[in-house]
């Protein structure tokens, strides 16, 4: 497991940790609530691997999980942790970015608990 320090410069959403969990050739990336600008700093600062699973940023906000991140780490699947909310998360814009990147998308509001197993 690798834990990266905050790279944002303002707001609580930009000051969270990034976590890369690796088991053999299987990698999962958790970016928290950072926006696309901070994600760009992340991929410019660290040599991140291609990943299998991305915990989609900020519950599928249109401001997170940007194209730069998706093109850099090329996730196969994305998990969106989301429930009933007044923000409209996940947004159609974010969902379109994920599917355009070729990802399989899983959502806790539709599938409930999501279990990922590694051989």
Predicted features along the sequence, with ranges:
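Core dinuclear metal-dependent hydrolase active-site scaffold
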Residues: 1-53, 110-119
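Cap/insert and terminal regions of metallo-dependent hydrolase folds
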Residues: 41-113
